[in-house]
Amino acid sequence: MQPTDPNRFTDQAWDAIVESQTVARQLRQQQLEVEHVLLALLDQESGVAAEILAKAGVAVANLRQPLEDFARRQPRNASGTQLYLGRGLDRLLDLAERARELWQDEFIGVEHLLMGFVEDDRIGRRLAQGLKLDAKTLETTIQALRSPAADEAEAEESEPSYPFLSKYGRDLTALAEQEKLDPVIGRDLEIRRVIQVLSRRSKNNPVLIGEPGVGKTAIAEGLAQRIVAGEVPDSLKQRRLISLDMGSLIAGAKYRGEFEERLRAVLHEVTHSDGQMVLFIDELHTVVGAGAGQQGSAMDAGNLLKPMLARGELRCIGATTTDEYRRTIEKDPALERRFQQVYVSQPSVEDTIAILRGLKERYEGHHGVKITDGALMAAAKLSHRYISDRFLPDKAIDLIDEASAQLKMEITSKPSELEDLERRLLQLEMEQLSLSGENGQASVHSDRLQQIQTELQTLQEQQARLNQQWQQEKQLLEELGRLQEEEETLRQQVNQAEREHDLNKGAELKFGQLEALQQQRQAIEEQIQALHANGQTLLREQVEEADIAEIVARWTNIPVQRLLESERQKLLQLESFLHQRVIGQDEAVVAVAAAIRRARAGMKDPSRPIGSFLFLGPTGVGKTELARALANCLFDAEDALIRFDMSEYMEKNSISRLIGAPPGYIGYEEGGQLSEAIRRHPYAVVLFDEVEKAHPDVFNLLLQVLDDGRITDSQGRTIDFCNAVIVMTSNIGSQFILEMGEEEASLDAVELKVLGALRQHFRPEFLNRIDDTILFQPLSRGQLQQIVDIQLQRLKRLLAEQAIALNVTPAAAANLADRGYDPVYGARPLKRAIQRLIENPVASLILEQQFDAGDALIVDVDAEGQLQFQVSKPVTATVVEPDDSPAIAVEAIPS
């Protein structure tokens, strides 16, 4: 094909010429002609040519078929691959060029090609006459379709008939008329301020600035609803509020200047609408810099907006977050001064409850459930208290939405009672099949088979009854959901009729169909309430406070649900649970347990951690073990303990590891070890082990954690410690505690000495913020005996995994306690003694294969005070004489 300059054409016109080559090749024709180009134009996705022809009264199908027939009759050449420009197409391009010059356009567009087609002597004029289309009619249609935004085809992408606002915008007022927008509750001051700015003569462009989720977009939707209701000044009545979709505006803009031309066309349509259009740009910061990479930094979208904004030709509402406004808009003072700031603050809990009450019917209709007022209040209060990284009302609305979705899923799924029953039935049927299939054993199992048959019959009757009840309840709830949806639709129709002043239709709907639906719904609700009164319901239809608390607990890992009876008993007996692992240290155990009970009963200070403790005492007395036991008791897992060995934070710069490196340093994006751990697991036990070894600057960081329950990490995020237990351990003053020995009378004097040593090392403002400073006393021999039992239980569990039982006599346990007792080092020498005196010999016996599965290892003390081991074989059904007992003697292990 001969070269043709693509710079003479708009993008769509050139795309049609390029695509015409594909059409010609499919027809195996070497000569590119008019029919190929027109077929390509009719096939374009944008449909500009088809739209122009349709407006001119030509059915596209009536034109396509004759074109295809004519093209198939042209000569074919299967061997040729080179395409040539036909004489007819060359003539068409000349005619299109004349039309361009006549209309004073810069590029040849689709409309110019169509004008050339109807004047084409070869095929176009003949087909056009058959369809009653002439050049004059087509020209009139094209001029009528020319968008105000594109009087000339001055850019490569622009097509005069393109409906830019409908393609790149969303009419909020039309959605408000159709009742498709959620009701906007409150925000009267902000909406009034927006209306006030829009009513100005110049710079009439408000920008809504607020945190994500506070309701900036909802304010624009509220304005659209007020425009539809006529509750606005005359300057805004009958106006259209169009939300600009920046995503679709930018998407696919691959050619030079394409994005800018799209935006310019949209802005021209708005400015030439005689003030009928108000533009809403959500995420306004995306406009600044958009498109700058295509034609240089001077040609971004923000610079296209500035002149129109300053002159008042364009009324535009922007919305962006506080951070993005600071990062983008404020850096361009010329753009910033053209917008008037309207700050949108987070609503209070009371305002959020009012917003949720306004949205309640929409969510009930969507999910087909009922939402109690208590659930709405719980959503506002619990989200405000426990979800600190998001903002009201968005997080409260999300709680209601997810809790409703969860309940709807439960309604459509089988109840847990029915599933448990079916599993039990399956288990019994498998057992029955197994016992019946054993040859010759049927008589042996006859009693059990009879029991299974009786139980199966009972369970099957129960299953049939529950199935019937479930289907009945499910049908009632589904019918209730359907009626709620219909009621919501009717309400929308009533509102629309009232807006249109169609009082007859409104009264007919409101007092006829709507009342009938409400009576049906009330009857079904009474049936459901009757089932509830009998206490026989399998399904729930109401979202309650407990559902909201469950969602909050799932999101945050903070237990905010109502206490179950099992957990209530566990909390009341928390000291005994902790004492199963921590021997002695009653004061510390009682203080920690009391703090946990206060928190779960809702009596703690909401702005401080659950508890902050400083454990003091010599090594090995249970300071770290108590923190581990607490984590295990609360979370049933020791790995729930967030532990920091403060000996790793002895340098000044190591504090950045806790809250994150400052900007400009490596690791800034990764966050801090402490801040990230608490952000992901806010309900945790945080242990700062051997806190006195840390650099003094670390304690400055801990001040706000202990007092306000919060810190700010390197990225400016607030980390909430209000649901954490802070435990710090230290060996400061342990020498004074060791001097005390077992004399109770010297406790006060020792405590004074220890506190004096604390004051010398820690500053008063740090010590004053700790809830309780607890002294751990040295372990006595009696307490060490109890620790022996705990340590041996661990060893018994390890051996039980190898089918070996371990029996330690009381004398052997006392012997271990004596050998492991050291008041200076606490319980750690005992652990080493057990390792040396029991674990090492047992490991050797296992490797020597002295044990079989089911054997028992007995540990006792001989006459010389040394431990001895004996392997006991399991007793079999065969009676063996005592003299033949195969006992294995093991030499005593010296100390």
From Swiss-Prot:
Region (Linker): 347-557
PROSITE patterns: CLP_R, CLPAB_1, CLPAB_2
Domain of life: Bacteria
GO biological process entries: cellular response to heat; protein refolding
Region (Repeat 1) location: 9-74
One GO CC term, this protein: cytoplasm
Residues noted as binding ATP 1 in the record, renumbered to the chain: 210-217
Gene Ontology molecular function: any one: ATP hydrolysis activity
Signal peptide segment: none
Clp R domain location: 6-148
Location(s), subcellular: Cytoplasm
Region (C-terminal): 779-895
Domains: entry comment: The Clp repeat (R) domain probably functions as a substrate-discriminating domain, recruiting aggregated proteins to the ClpB hexamer and/or stabilizing bound proteins. The NBD2 domain is responsible for oligomerization, whereas the NBD1 domain stabilizes the hexamer probably in an ATP-dependent manner. The movement of the coiled-coil domain is essential for ClpB ability to rescue proteins from an aggregated state, probably by pulling apart large aggregated proteins, which are bound between the coiled-coils motifs of adjacent ClpB subunits in the functional hexamer.
Stated role: Part of a stress-induced multi-chaperone system, it is involved in the recovery of the cell from heat-induced damage, in cooperation with DnaK, DnaJ and GrpE. Acts before DnaK, in the processing of protein aggregates. Protein binding stimulates the ATPase activity; ATP hydrolysis unfolds the denatured protein aggregates, which probably helps expose new hydrophobic binding sites on the surface of ClpB-bound aggregates, contributing to the solubilization and refolding of denatured protein aggregates by DnaK.
Family under the similarity heading: Belongs to the ClpA/ClpB family.
Protein name: Chaperone protein ClpB 2
Source organism: Synechococcus elongatus (strain ATCC 33912 / PCC 7942 / FACHB-805) (Anacystis nidulans R2)
Gene designation: clpB2
